[in-house]
Curated annotation (Swiss-Prot):
GO molecular function ontology, one term from the record: ribonuclease P activity
Keywords attached to this entry: Cytoplasm, Endonuclease, Hydrolase, Nuclease, tRNA processing
UniProt entry tagged with the keyword Cytoplasm: yes
Catalyzed reactions: Endonucleolytic cleavage of RNA, removing 5'-extranucleotides from tRNA precursor
Location of this chain's protein in the cell: Cytoplasm
Physiological role: Part of ribonuclease P, a protein complex that generates mature tRNA molecules by cleaving their 5'-ends.
Gene (UniProt): rnp1
GO biological process: tRNA 5'-leader removal
Quaternary structure and interacting proteins, as annotated: Consists of a catalytic RNA component and at least 4-5 protein subunits.
Recorded GO CC terms: cytoplasm; ribonuclease P complex
Family to which this protein belongs: Belongs to the eukaryotic/archaeal RNase P protein component 1 family.
Protein name: Ribonuclease P protein component 1
Amino acid sequence: MKFSQNILRHELVGLNLEIVNSTDKRLISTKGRVINETRNMLVIEKNNGKEITVPKEISIFRFEFSDLDTPKKVDIDGRLLIGRPEDRLKRKIKQLYPY
């Protein structure tokens, strides 16, 4: 499988992210590292050390993946991430993009 098809099954804890769009305008442009994930929320540690909890459903996230030596940035709609992390790994994902 290609990298693009595995993104939704990837472990998110430890990844750097930026919120690129959200219905809560205060969250847009927030950057940090994912430190915990629940069914509906991501806990993000911002660069200043503060922790915030962000609902997955209302945001679009830009994750930074380190694939070998080339970092990749990928935008993911938070609605696709809803669910417990361990269940998301098992879930069948409809092909959304013709990669």
